[in-house]
Protein backbone atom coordinates (compact mmCIF):
# COMPACT_ATOMS: atom_id res chain seq x y z
CA UNK A 1 0.00 0.00 0.00
CA UNK A 2 1.23 3.43 -0.86
CA UNK A 3 1.37 6.11 1.78
CA UNK A 4 0.14 9.54 0.89
CA UNK A 5 2.01 12.69 1.82
CA UNK A 6 -0.13 14.76 4.15
CA UNK A 7 0.58 18.47 3.97
CA UNK A 8 1.01 20.12 7.35
CA UNK A 9 -1.88 22.43 8.19
CA UNK A 10 -1.05 25.99 9.12
CA UNK A 11 -3.03 29.12 9.84
CA UNK A 12 -2.72 31.48 6.89
CA UNK A 13 -3.85 34.46 8.96
CA UNK A 14 -1.15 33.91 11.58
CA UNK A 15 1.52 33.52 8.90
CA UNK A 16 0.48 36.78 7.21
CA UNK A 17 0.09 38.69 10.53
CA UNK A 18 -3.55 39.55 9.84
CA UNK A 19 -5.07 41.53 12.71
CA UNK A 20 -8.71 41.27 11.66
CA UNK A 21 -10.60 39.48 8.90
CA UNK A 22 -12.69 41.83 6.78
CA UNK A 23 -16.15 40.81 5.61
CA UNK A 24 -15.65 42.79 2.38
CA UNK A 25 -12.71 40.62 1.31
CA UNK A 26 -14.83 38.17 -0.70
CA UNK A 27 -11.87 36.47 -2.43
CA UNK A 28 -10.45 35.31 0.90
CA UNK A 29 -13.82 34.34 2.35
CA UNK A 30 -14.69 32.16 -0.65
CA UNK A 31 -11.71 29.93 0.15
CA UNK A 32 -13.33 29.02 3.47
CA UNK A 33 -16.83 28.25 2.15
CA UNK A 34 -17.82 25.01 0.40
CA UNK A 35 -19.70 24.84 -2.88
CA UNK A 36 -22.89 24.18 -0.96
CA UNK A 37 -22.32 27.31 1.14
CA UNK A 38 -21.10 25.74 4.40
CA UNK A 39 -18.24 27.22 6.41
CA UNK A 40 -15.24 24.87 6.27
CA UNK A 41 -14.19 23.75 9.79
CA UNK A 42 -10.80 24.65 11.22
CA UNK A 43 -9.73 21.00 11.57
CA UNK A 44 -9.71 20.86 7.76
CA UNK A 45 -8.27 24.31 6.99
CA UNK A 46 -5.84 24.51 9.93
CA UNK A 47 -7.08 27.94 10.98
CA UNK A 48 -6.53 28.88 14.64
CA UNK A 49 -9.61 29.23 16.86
CA UNK A 50 -9.28 33.02 17.15
CA UNK A 51 -9.31 33.47 13.39
CA UNK A 52 -11.95 30.78 12.84
CA UNK A 53 -14.37 32.82 14.99
CA UNK A 54 -13.53 36.00 13.07
CA UNK A 55 -13.89 34.10 9.81
CA UNK A 56 -17.32 32.75 10.73
CA UNK A 57 -18.48 36.22 11.79
CA UNK A 58 -17.16 37.79 8.56
CA UNK A 59 -18.82 35.12 6.38
CA UNK A 60 -22.15 35.59 8.17
CA UNK A 61 -21.95 39.37 7.73
CA UNK A 62 -21.09 38.98 4.04
CA UNK A 63 -24.05 36.63 3.59
CA UNK A 64 -26.38 39.09 5.34
CA UNK A 65 -25.24 41.89 3.01
CA UNK A 66 -25.62 39.58 -0.03
CA UNK A 67 -21.90 39.64 -0.80
CA UNK A 68 -21.81 35.84 -0.42
CA UNK A 69 -24.66 33.42 -1.16
CA UNK A 70 -26.19 31.35 1.63
CA UNK A 71 -26.34 28.32 -0.69
CA UNK A 72 -25.19 27.39 -4.18
CA UNK A 73 -27.19 28.03 -7.33
CA UNK A 74 -30.06 25.59 -7.67
CA UNK A 75 -30.17 24.89 -11.40
CA UNK A 76 -33.03 22.74 -12.59
From Swiss-Prot:
For molecular function, the Gene Ontology terms on record are: small ribosomal subunit rRNA binding; structural constituent of ribosome
- What GO biological process, any one, is recorded here? translation
Residue span of the signal peptide, if any? none
Keywords, ordered alphabetically: Ribonucleoprotein, Ribosomal protein, RNA-binding, rRNA-binding
PROSITE patterns given for it? RIBOSOMAL_S18 (PS00057)
A GO CC annotation recorded here is: cytosolic small ribosomal subunit
Similarity field:
Belongs to the bacterial ribosomal protein bS18 family.
NCBIfam families in UniProt: S18
Function according to Swiss-Prot or TrEMBL: Binds as a heterodimer with protein bS6 to the central domain of the 16S rRNA, where it helps stabilize the platform of the 30S subunit.
Q: Which PANTHER family does this entry report, sorted A to Z?
A: 30S RIBOSOMAL PROTEIN S18 (PTHR13479), SMALL RIBOSOMAL SUBUNIT PROTEIN BS18M (PTHR13479:SF40)
- Oligomer and partners: Part of the 30S ribosomal subunit. Forms a tight heterodimer with protein bS6.
Could you tell me what this protein is called? Small ribosomal subunit protein bS18
Amino acid sequence: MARYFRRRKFCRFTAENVTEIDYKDIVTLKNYVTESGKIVPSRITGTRAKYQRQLARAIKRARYLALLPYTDLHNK
